[in-house]
Amino acid sequence: MKYQLNLTALRCPIPLLSAKKALKNLDKNDELMLILNLESAVENFSIFAEENSVALVEQYYASEKEFIVILKK
């Protein structure tokens, strides 16, 4: 399944903590799309994926104010 989590209103480290909490509730092969603002530390999600044994499927700019990170459990 695919899930989405809008974290644009949050500042670091809350997006990382929220993503970690959400991933705990997902099944293997589920995907989690994270919507972040540019103030979020989006580069940290590469490290986060490695440390939490999840795949970083994709990262891209959705607009000037939103960055998308897709993780797969």
UniProtKB/Swiss-Prot annotation:
Origin: domain of life: Bacteria
Catalytic-site annotation from UniProt: 12 (cysteine persulfide intermediate)
Pfam family, one: TusA
Family matches, as InterPro entries: TusA-like, TusA-like_sf
Family the UniProt entry places it in: Belongs to the sulfur carrier protein TusA family.
Stated name of the protein: Putative sulfur carrier protein HI_0242
Organism of origin: Haemophilus influenzae (strain ATCC 51907 / DSM 11121 / KW20 / Rd)
Lineage: Bacteria, Pseudomonadati, Pseudomonadota, Gammaproteobacteria, Pasteurellales
